[in-house]
Amino acid sequence: MSASTVLPVRDRLRIAIQKSGRLTEPARRLLTSCGLSWRQSRDKLFCYGESLPVDLLLVRDDDIPGLIAQGVCDLGIVGRNELDEQAASRRRNGLPVPYQTLRGLHFGQCRLMLAVPEEWEWQDISQLTGKRIATSYPAILADWLQTHHIAAQIVELSGSVEIAPRLGTADLICDLVSSGATLTAHQLKPVIQIMESQAVLAGMIRQPADARAGLLAMLLRRIDGMVNLRDSNLLMFRAFQEHLDALTRLLPDADPLVQLPDDGSGTLRVQTMCHGTITWQRLEELERAGAQGLMVLTVERSLA
């Protein structure tokens, strides 16, 4: 589809991302790397797609699931924790969940964990019975407590959860943990992981059937081409035929070796995509096994 194609407003794809926060810049970098560019409006909340009919809405992260559910946006980049919290809340209130996770994006990783004061002698989850747990994720926590048959009081807070035990409003907390530095600063220690989270691409379960369908398929393919190649490199080298089996065993995280046309040098030209770190030590090990002229090339994007 040409970038100059003019579509009705309802046929322009809309993507919501966090206006300001830890997912904002990685989300914009991902979309930009997929070939999208925008013209920003005066209020800086709406970005009109220029390279393709794909517009961007800059909103609060906790508004994104609702905007998708209402059909205001077709897609959203949001933390799995926020998406699952609102989905759990809808289910507990007897409401349908009209959105789904389309792709994990492998950035913004964190964990939702129970954390207790450092002076606690933690043994097992039976210690949670009758306790007050402060959290910004009451629906996820309620489901977890119900699954484990634990009767505890949930204290819902919109922020500053980690200070609740020191204020006496809760006995422990359930909150997101990245490095753990915030817990340490508030004399807390993590004891149980409730869930792992990362940034995800979310969208409606019922996909659009108009011109947006083609845009969505194209965008998903480009995102796959970026995300699937994260931490991957193209490895190229020369080797004699009798060394290929040994070299293959040294590349367990690589795609099958591809032999390029013979150039008459007597050795085979070989390339493969490696999906793990290629250190100097690995290159030297490959060289000892018979690889010659080793080259490691960064791959920015790919269409499989």
Curated annotation (Swiss-Prot):
Requisite cofactors: Mg(2+)
Which pathway is this protein assigned to?
Amino-acid biosynthesis; L-histidine biosynthesis; L-histidine from 5-phospho-alpha-D-ribose 1-diphosphate: step 1/9
Write down the species: Xylella fastidiosa (strain M12)
Write one Gene Ontology MF term: ATP phosphoribosyltransferase activity
The EC code for this enzyme is 2.4.2.17
- Enzyme class, broadest EC rank: transferase
Ribosomal protein recorded as keyword: no
Per the entry, what this protein does is: Catalyzes the condensation of ATP and 5-phosphoribose 1-diphosphate to form N'-(5'-phosphoribosyl)-ATP (PR-ATP). Has a crucial role in the pathway because the rate of histidine biosynthesis seems to be controlled primarily by regulation of HisG enzymatic activity.
What are the GO BP annotations of this UniProt entry?
L-histidine biosynthetic process
Ways its activity is controlled: Feedback inhibited by histidine.
Where would you find this protein in the cell? Answer: Cytoplasm
Recorded GO cellular component terms are: cytoplasm
Keywords linked to the UniProt accession: Amino-acid biosynthesis, ATP-binding, Cytoplasm, Glycosyltransferase, Histidine biosynthesis, Magnesium, Metal-binding, Nucleotide-binding, Transferase
What is the name of the protein in this document?
Answer: ATP phosphoribosyltransferase
Record has Glycosyltransferase as a keyword:
yes
Query: What InterPro entries does the record tag this protein with?
Result: ATP-PRT_HisG_long, ATP_PRibTrfase_cat, ATP_PRibTrfase_CS, ATP_PRibTrfase_HisG, HisG_C, N-reg_PII/ATP_PRibTrfase_C
- Name the SUPFAM superfamilies on file: Periplasmic binding protein-like II
Give the protein family.
Belongs to the ATP phosphoribosyltransferase family. Long subfamily.
Q: Indicate where this protein is primarily found.
A: cytoplasm
Q: Which reaction does it catalyse?
A: 1-(5-phospho-beta-D-ribosyl)-ATP + diphosphate = 5-phospho-alpha-D-ribose 1-diphosphate + ATP
* Short name of one Pfam family: HisG_C
